[in-house]
Design a protein with these regions (language model features):
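Alpha-helical transmembrane cores and adjacent cytosolic helix/loop segments
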Residues: 1-190
């Protein structure tokens, strides 16, 4: 593996991993379901970059790691769905200014990761999987900003809960798809 490839993937994994941590820690006091769901997207991006980094070193991804990734995605997505339901019932009001600021910080992290991808596109072997989750991260960050603006406009927590719940639901579905595909692949290899 080339040194610049390892550095690029390491930088992407670090940026997205830090954003996952920061956004998940700020989502709690901000009472934002959309931010919690967006943090999941960054977790997925960091894991994908990590697997691409390992694949570039000749590591063969074992079937159990695929199944584990799918199961973890489903569990985390389900937890955010439960948080959304609880916030809907309790009526906790998110902090829109915090959501907007974090949305723009997350977009800048996405921009940084995409810039690294574009500058390294000829060298990276696992670029397609990392690129797919980069797009999903950007959509998630824009959704956080949109949810914050809708919260301000409606003076309700419903936009944040709906957007965050929908993002988390997609995460559960994606985890299920990974589990299903991973099991099918494992059965074919027997």
């Amino acid at each position: 593996m080339l040194e610049h490839e390892r550095i690029a993937l390491s930088m992407i994994a670090f940026i997205t991993g830090m954003m996952a941590f920061i956004e998940s820690m700020i989502a709690v006091p901000a009472a934002s379901t959309a931010m919690a769901a967006d943090a999941l997207s960054f977790v997925q991006h960091s894991v994908s970059a990590g697997f691409a980094l390992r694949a570039a070193t000749g590591f063969k991804r074992h079937r159990w790691t695929i199944l584990l990734q799918g199961a973890v995605m489903m569990v985390l997505g389900a937890l955010v769905c439960l948080i959304a339901a609880r916030r809907l019932v309790q009526g906790s009001f998110p902090h829109p200014l915090t959501m907007i600021i974090m949305g723009f910080i997350a977009l800048s992290a996405n921009f940084s990761a995409c810039t690294i991808l574009l500058l390294s596109r000829r060298q990276l072997t696992g670029i397609m999987s990392v690129w797919r989750v980069s797009r999903a991260d950007a959509v998630g960050s824009i959704s956080v900003i949109a949810a914050a603006l809708a919260v301000v406009a409606t003076r309700s927590n419903i936009p944040d809960v709906v957007i965050g719940g929908a993002m988390a639901g997609l995460f559960v579905a994606q985890g299920w798809r990974i589990l299903y595909t991973g099991r099918a692949d494992a059965n074919q290899m027997r």
